[in-house]
Amino acid sequence: RIFTCAYAYRMTGDTKYLTKAETDMNAVCNFPDWNSKRHFLDVGEMATAVAFGYDWLYNELSAATRTKAANALLKFAFQQAQNKNWNLNFYEATNNWNQVCNGGLVCAALASYENNPSEAKDMIEKALESNKPALEVMYSPDGNYPEGSGYWCYGTLYQVLMLAALNSTLGTDNGLSDTP
């Protein structure tokens, strides 16, 4: 809902969407964690939502919400992605997990770069490194996707969000969109 409400607010200017997005951002940032130990895919989804709310609504969010969101991205996404105490196999995965987790981490890193530059840089570099080999498997030959159409839609959504965020923020996706 954060993504949808943030978009709706930007398109209409109706503050009910801003209020709902900010309420939801505060709610998820108050969670004790984003389920990283059991299902890192949840982290990718939460990081994406908070990142878009943070970025698209930044000037309208309260200072407390901005701080809470930046801290949550650091604690619940970046630090968990760097945690060596459990196996984060999405980095090597050649399925939707690679796209969703890396996509969420990259969107979060780009949105909150000023707050966490070292961690953000690490997230972006690791995602660029691990996403390209996955793309080479997932969409070849000729755009085929090994998990079927449902997961194609799910994984590709996060892939496109990541590519768009990289291009709009950095001016390049480092060649990912050229991957055969």
Summary of predicted features, one role per range:
Residues 1-180:
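Aromatic-lined, polymer-binding surfaces characteristic
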